[in-house]
Each structure stands twice: as structure tokens, then as C-alpha cells.
């Protein structure tokens, strides 16, 4: 196992900068997830760690060794791609041992490692089969096993579940989490799926347009996003945003006016907040309340009702703000499209963002953070 450090790492192709001044510390044995929208630079960052892309400037360390000029084969990293990339004419055992064979490993060593990894990944009964006889989940386990038998110090996974259906993704997500707990290897995982990020990671790195937007534990990013981008990206359905104006400030409180002229005091850091400033109030769909238990409410017309069985998502058009809000409630809520529906804003669950997108730190203590 090994730690990974990036110091002021930048990647550019000509005038196009795809990774900007990246500074990261990934500790020995950590499971770190790079997450962000398409084109944010997460796969490029992973490929620089693997040695498949050169670093334009900055330094990469694996353990105590600077890796900028070290070829991929000598870095002690193993990589799993979105594509399984299995040889169709080779058996599972032959696919898993292929890299060791090229490296000149002895047959006894290859067999021992393949058998050990096959037991861990529940592939022992499939070692003689060809890839065409395997399910998608089994093929992905073979691809992971091929990397594991090389005993890398750092394990890199680039969107490994993207080709699987929804049920298999859930199953493989659980298996990868168990695998990490069992092996204790340093793992870096790339995904655009924030559910994968939240459920797998010890630490999440949110990337936006080639920069690190925020690094933290999953619940920290969910409850205390550093800016509006992170707030909108982490969580599903995404956070609701309302335009507000600051009407007063106090110690550890800011009062804002909603578009319907109602005012609400928010428990957030008030340092540097100016009366009269235009800001954005954020509230997650699951944190909105029924109107009968809230002091501050918004009323609108139901546009869409999504019944998911275990929960209901209601899209409400609020005339005062000329936009839809999403309200999410556990269990079934029976309401007709076109009906009038009111929702409440709990001050302690609200977020406040400046015009530049940065967050005013919430002061309400959330569990697990």
C-alpha cells in the first residue's frame, strides 16, 4: 500500500488547461472517489497518477517517490477501466494471470495469486470459463481480479460500473466496498455518479472544470458544501435554489427576504455579508417541510408528481420566484397535478450562497459530521 500526493499538478494540451493546480493528499489505505460532471478532468487526473498522461507542471508522489518521470509499469499501480478489456479466447484464469505471464512470473506464483484472488472475488468456480460465458458483473470481477493479482500498491478504477445495469451496479458497488475493507488497499475511484461517490468513499474529491471544488467526507459535502456547484451536484434530486436579498445581519445569523416578501433568519456565518446583497438560498428537496409545521412557507401549483413507492417527489411552480421547486417526502403523498400545494422552509436546514457561489458556513450541527 502507499499514499498518493499531488502538488500543484496541472495538465494542459496547448492552450487548453484540463487540470488546474491540483493539490491532494490521499492517505495509505484510503478509498477516495473523484466525482464531477463529464469534462471536469477526473479521468485525466487518474491517468496522470497511472502514468498514462504526462504532467505539464507540478509533482506527483506515490509513497516517498516522485513519479513524474517514472514509467507506468514501475509505479506500482493497477487500473480497471470502464471496458472489461478481456481476451475472448482466454479463460478467466488466463485473463487474470496474463500480466504476470508477460512479466515472467513463475507458474506456481501465478496459480497461487489467481486462486487467492478468485476466492476473494467469488470466481473460483469460473476459472476455466471464457468471457462469453460470464455475466456483466462476473466479467467486471475478472477485470478487477486481473489487477489484484499484480498486487499493486495503489488501485485505480475509472468508471468501472458504467456498463452494468442498475441492479448489477448496486451489487458491484457493495462488492467493491467489501473488497476494500478486506484488502485495505489505497483505492482511487472515478465516477460521475454521486450515489456511487457517497456510498463508497472515505473521502470525496469534487472536481469542477479542472479544479478541486471541495474535498471531504461524504456527509460533510452533503451538509456543508463549500459552494453552490458542490451543493447542486451532491444529492439527488439536486438542491433547490431561490434568489434572496439580505435585509439584516447579527452574530451568527443572516436575515434574508424571499421573492414573496417573507423574511427568514438563517443560522449561518454572517462575517462579510452586507445588507442589500443579492444571494441564493439553497434547500434540499428532502429538507422541505409540510406547510402546517413551518413558519415560512411558499405556495405554488403542482406541475409533476413522481410516485416512487417509498417516496414521492413533487415539482411545484412557485409564481413568486418563477421557477419550480422539488419537494421530496418519504412514503406516498396523494396530490393531483394542477393542485395548489404549500411547502415550508426550516431555517436550520437552509444554505446561503454569495454571488460568487461561495457558501456562508452553516452553523446547525448535523449528525455524522
From Swiss-Prot:
GO cellular component terms listed in the entry, alphabetical order: ATP-binding cassette (ABC) transporter complex, substrate-binding subunit-containing; maltose transport complex
Superkingdom as given in the UniProt entry: Bacteria
Catalytic activity of the protein: D-maltose(out) + ATP + H2O = D-maltose(in) + ADP + phosphate + H(+)
SMART domains attached to this UniProt entry: AAA
EC number(s) reported in the record: 7.5.2.1
Residues annotated as domain ABC transporter: 4-234
Entry-linked InterPro entries: AAA+_ATPase, ABC_transporter-like_ATP-bd, ABC_transporter-like_CS, ABC_transpr_MalK-like, ABC_transpr_MalK/UgpC-like, Mo/tungstate-bd_C_term_dom, NA-bd_OB-fold, P-loop_NTPase
Pfam families: ABC_tran (PF00005), TOBE_2 (PF08402)
Keywords: ATP-binding, Cell inner membrane, Cell membrane, Membrane, Nucleotide-binding, Sugar transport, Translocase, Transport
Family to which this protein belongs: Belongs to the ABC transporter superfamily. Maltooligosaccharide importer (TC 3.A.1.1.1) family.
Subunit structure: The complex is composed of two ATP-binding proteins (MalK), two transmembrane proteins (MalG and MalK) and a solute-binding protein (MalE).
Name of this protein: Maltose/maltodextrin import ATP-binding protein MalK
Species of provenance: Salmonella paratyphi A (strain ATCC 9150 / SARB42)
Amino acid at each position: 500500500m502507499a499514499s498518493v500526493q499531488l502538488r500543484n499538478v496541472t495538465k494542459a494540451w496547448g492552450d487548453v488547461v484540463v487540470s488546474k493546480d491540483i493539490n491532494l493528499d490521499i492517505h495509505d489505505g484510503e478509498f477516495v472517489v473523484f466525482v464531477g460532471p463529464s469534462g471536469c478532468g477526473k479521468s485525466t487526473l487518474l491517468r496522470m497518477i497511472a502514468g498514462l498522461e504526462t504532467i505539464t507542471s507540478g509533482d506527483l508522489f506515490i509513497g516517498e517517490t516522485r513519479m513524474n518521470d517514472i514509467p507506468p509499469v514501475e509505479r506500482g499501480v493497477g487500473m480497471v477501466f470502464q471496458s472489461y478489456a478481456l481476451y475472448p479466447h482466454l479463460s478467466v484464469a488466463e485473463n487474470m494471470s496474463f500480466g504476470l505471464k508477460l512479466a515472467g512470473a513463475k507458474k506456481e506464483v501465478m496459480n497461487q495469486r489467481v486462486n487467492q484472488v478468485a476466492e476473494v472475488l467469488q470466481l473460483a468456480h469460473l476459472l476455466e470459463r471464457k468471457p462469453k460465458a460470464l455475466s456483466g458483473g462476473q466479467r467486471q470481477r475478472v477485470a478487477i481480479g486481473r489487477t489484484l493479482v499484480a498486487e499493486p500498491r495503489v488501485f485505480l478504477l475509472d468508471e468501472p460500473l458504467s456498463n452494468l445495469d442498475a441492479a448489477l451496479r448496486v451489487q458491484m458497488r457493495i462488492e467493491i466496498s467489501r473488497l476494500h475493507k478486506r484488502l485495505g488497499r489505497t483505492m482511487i475511484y472515478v465516477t460521475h455518479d454521486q450515489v456511487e461517490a457517497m456510498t463508497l468513499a472515505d473521502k470525496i474529491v469534487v472536481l469542477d472544470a479542472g479544479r478541486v471544488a471541495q474535498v471531504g467526507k461524504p456527509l460533510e459535502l452533503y451538509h456543508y458544501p463549500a459552494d453552490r456547484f458542490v451543493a447542486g451536484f451532491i444529492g439527488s434530486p439536486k438542491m433547490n435554489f431561490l434568489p434572496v436579498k439580505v435585509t439584516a445581519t447579527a452574530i451568527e445569523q443572516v436575515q434574508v427576504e424571499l421573492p414573496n416578501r417573507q423574511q427568514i433568519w438563517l443560522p449561518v456565518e454572517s462575517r462579510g455579508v452586507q445588507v442589500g446583497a443579492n444571494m441564493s438560498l439553497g434547500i434540499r428537496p428532502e429538507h422541505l417541510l409540510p406547510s402546517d409545521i413551518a413558519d415560512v412557507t411558499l405556495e405554488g401549483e403542482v406541475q409533476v408528481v413522481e410516485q416512487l413507492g417509498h417516496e414521492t417527489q413533487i415539482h411545484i411552480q412557485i409564481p413568486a420566484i418563477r421557477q419550480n421547486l422539488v419537494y421530496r417526502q418519504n412514503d406516498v403523498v396523494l396530490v393531483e397535478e394542477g393542485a395548489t400545494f404549500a411547502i415550508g422552509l426550516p431555517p436550520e436546514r437552509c444554505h446561503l450562497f454569495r454571488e460568487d457561489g461561495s457558501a456562508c458556513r452553516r452553523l446547525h450541527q448535523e449528525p455524522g459530521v
